[in-house]
C-alpha cells in the first residue's frame, strides 16, 4: 500500500471518529480529548490550550522558517433539513457524510497526516500543527487564546475547504450596532420625534454608498442592514430605532478605517461589536503562492471568514472540500479529496 493511501486511510478513520462526537462551538471538549489521544498514539507530543491542541516539536537550533498548519475542531449546529443522522459517519461510494466532514474536518485530518509525514521526511519548513476551537463563533477561547502560545510563525496554511485552490485574500468582518435616537410621544397628536424617520437618511446612505477601493481579489467592501428593531406599540412614537449592519471589508481597508468613515457619515450612533476580524492578504509573489501556481492551482479571494482573520503573519486558506457544502444539510467530503489534499500538501512542502 502506498504512503498516500496509508495516510488517507488514517485520516478517514479519524474523521469518522470525530463526526461521531458532537463538537458544536464552545462544546468541543470530547472531540478535543479524542484528537489529543490519537495524536499521542501517533507518537507525537500535543499540548492542550483549553480545547485547542498544539503540536510543536521544533528544534531550538533549527533555522528553517516556521509554517503553521491550522484547521478547526468545532462545527455549527446541524440544520433541521438533514436527511441523515449528522453524527453518524456514512460512507457512500466516495462520499463521507457527517457534520463537520467538509468544514473543516477534511482539512483538520489531512494537515495532521502531513505533519506526521514530515516527521520522517525532509521539509524546507519547520511545521507546527494547531487544531483550534470556537472558529465558527470567533470565540475568545479559540485561536485567540492559542495565539500567544505559538512560536514566531513565518507563514500559515488554514485548511478550510477551498477545493485545494489557494485563497490568498479573505474579507474581514464587522458587525455594527447603529442606533437612531428620537423622542417618544402620543401618535395621535404628532408629538415627539420619530426615531424611524430619523434613521431613514442613514438607511438610504448604507444602501447606496459604494466604497472607492475595489479589490481585484475580493471585490468591493460591502455593507448590509440585516436587522431593524423599533417601537413598542402602535400609538407610541418610537424614541429608538436599532439596526444591525454587516460589513465585509476587503484587504484595501482596515476595519478601523471603515468604522471611522461610517461614523463620520451617519447621524445615528454607531458602535462596532469588534474590529479584530480584519481582512487579510498574502503577497502573490510569496514562495508558497508561487509553488501553488507551479502545481497548477489558481489563487483567488475568499468572501468567507476563518481564523485567518486573527493571524498577524502571512497566511492563506487551502484545504479539501468545497465551501458551498459548509453549514448545509447532508454535509459531506469526498475521500478522494482528502487523498488529493495530502498528496498536494506533500508536493508543495517538499520543494517550496
Regions found by a protein language model. Give the residues of each.
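N-terminal helical capping/dimerization or prosegment-like subdomains
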Residues: 1-78, 240-244, 258-261, 335-339, ...
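Metal-dependent amide/peptide-bond hydrolase catalytic core
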Residues: 6, 168, 177-352
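Buried hydrophobic packing segments
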Residues: 35, 108-118, 146, 199-202, ...
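Short glycine/proline-enriched coil/turn segments at helix->beta-strand junctions
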Residues: 40-45, 50-51, 63-64, 120-124, ...
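Short gly/ser/thr-rich secondary-structure transition/capping motifs
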Residues: 45-49, 140, 159, 223-228, ...
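Active-site metal-coordination/substrate-binding segment of hydrolases
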Residues: 64-128
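Hydrophobic/aromatic beta-strand patches that form the interior of the parallel beta-sheet core
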Residues: 67-69, 130, 155-157, 316-318
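Acidic/histidine-rich catalytic neighborhood of metal-dependent amide-processing enzymes
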Residues: 109-175, 179
Amino acid at each position: 500500500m502506498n504512503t498516500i493511501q496509508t495516510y488517507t486511510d488514517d485520516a478517514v478513520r479519524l474523521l469518522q471518529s470525530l463526526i461521531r462526537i458532537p463538537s458544536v462551538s464552545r462544546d468541543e471538549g470530547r472531540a478535543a480529548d479524542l484528537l489529543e489521544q490519537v495524536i499521542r498514539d501517533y507518537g507525537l507530543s500535543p499540548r492542550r490550550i483549553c480545547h485547542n491542541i498544539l503540536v510543536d516539536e521544533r528544534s531550538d537550533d533549527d533555522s528553517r522558517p516556521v509554517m503553521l498548519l491550522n484547521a478547526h475542531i468545532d462545527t455549527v449546529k446541524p440544520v433541521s433539513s438533514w436527511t441523515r443522522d449528522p453524527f453518524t459517519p456514512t460512507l457512500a461510494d466516495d462520499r463521507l457524510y457527517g457534520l463537520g466532514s467538509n468544514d473543516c474536518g477534511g482539512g483538520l485530518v489531512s494537515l495532521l497526516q502531513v505533519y506526521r509525514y514530515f516527521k520522517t521526511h525532509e521539509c524546507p519548513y519547520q511545521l507546527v500543527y494547531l487544531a483550534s476551537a470556537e472558529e465558527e463563533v470567533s470565540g475568545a477561547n479559540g485561536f485567540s487564546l492559542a495565539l500567544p502560545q505559538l512560536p514566531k510563525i513565518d507563514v500559515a496554511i488554514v485548511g478550510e475547504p477551498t477545493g485545494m485552490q489557494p485563497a490568498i485574500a479573505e474579507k474581514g468582518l464587522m458587525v455594527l450596532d447603529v442606533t437612531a435616537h428620537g423622542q417618544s410621544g402620543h401618535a395621535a397628536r404628532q408629538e415627539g420625534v420619530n426615531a424611524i424617520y430619523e434613521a431613514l437618511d442613514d438607511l438610504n446612505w448604507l444602501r447606496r454608498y459604494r466604497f472607492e477601493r475595489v479589490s481585484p481579489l475580493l471585490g468591493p467592501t460591502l455593507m448590509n442592514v440585516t436587522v431593524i428593531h423599533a417601537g413598542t406599540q402602535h400609538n407610541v412614537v418610537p424614541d429608538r430605532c436599532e439596526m444591525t449592519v454587516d460589513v465585509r471589508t476587503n484587504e484595501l481597508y482596515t476595519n478601523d478605517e471603515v468604522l471611522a468613515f461610517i461614523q463620520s457619515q451617519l447621524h445615528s450612533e454607531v458602535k462596532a461589536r469588534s474590529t479584530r476580524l480584519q481582512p487579510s492578504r498574502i503577497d502573490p509573489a510569496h514562495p508558497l503562492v508561487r509553488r501553488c501556481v507551479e502545481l497548477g492551482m489558481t489563487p483567488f479571494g475568499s468572501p468567507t471568514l476563518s481564523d485567518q482573520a486573527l493571524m498577524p503573519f502571512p497566511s492563506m486558506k487551502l484545504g479539501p472540500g468545497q465551501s458551498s457544502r459548509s453549514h448545509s444539510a447532508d454535509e459531506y467530503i469526498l475521500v478522494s479529496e482528502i487523498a488529493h489534499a495530502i498528496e498536494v500538501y506533500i508536493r508543495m512542502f517538499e520543494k517550496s
